[in-house]
Amino acid sequence: MVVYVTLIVMLFGSTLVFYSLSPYYSALGLVVFSVPGSFVLSFLGSSFVPIVLFLVYIGGMLVVFPYSSAISPERFPSVNNLGEVVGLVFLFSSWVFMSFDNFQDLKNIFHCFVSGESLVGSNTFYNSGGVLVILGVFVLLVALVGALIISRGIESTIIRAIWLW
């Protein structure tokens, strides 16, 4: 029953990200999504990956949230179509309850991903990803500079309103 509740909370967090036009609720939705996601991964048998996932989500939100809130022109944001969000959560949560009779079957499916019984070692898995990590850092740096340039020219953003006050 606990796993079902965590899946429903993950569903609520993801729909909050998709249906909110404001960065405030999107950041909240990602944090709401990361906590039960880490819990489900720890339930499946992994111990290190959920901690890394949670820290990456929280660290990413600490970087993205100030810049996205600087760009946002709304002082008091709201979630659009909150009734649709609640309806989708109810629809998909009923689907989750009807689909999984026994969650242990799902645990056996994902057991090969979190255990040490894979054919490829972790050294081979992480060895070829160094170039992609450097490329990802460069793309995030370009996006950060772009967000700063965009927010610098706008006079009606939240941070500009606080500075002018």
From Swiss-Prot:
Top-level taxon of the source organism: Eukaryota
Membrane topology: Multi-pass membrane protein
Enzyme Commission numbers on file: 7.1.1.2
Database matches in Pfam families: Oxidored_q3 (PF00499)
Transport as UniProt keyword: yes
GO MF, one annotated term: NADH dehydrogenase (ubiquinone) activity
Keywords for the protein's UniProt record, in alphabetical order: Electron transport, Membrane, Mitochondrion, NAD, Respiratory chain, Translocase, Transmembrane, Transmembrane helix, Transport, Ubiquinone
Swiss-Prot/TrEMBL catalytic activity: a ubiquinone + NADH + 5 H(+)(in) = a ubiquinol + NAD(+) + 4 H(+)(out)
Major enzyme class: translocase
Function (record text): Core subunit of the mitochondrial membrane respiratory chain NADH dehydrogenase (Complex I) that is believed to belong to the minimal assembly required for catalysis. Complex I functions in the transfer of electrons from NADH to the respiratory chain. The immediate electron acceptor for the enzyme is believed to be ubiquinone.
Protein name: NADH-ubiquinone oxidoreductase chain 6
Classification lineage: Eukaryota, Metazoa, Echinodermata, Eleutherozoa, Echinozoa
Gene name of the record: ND6
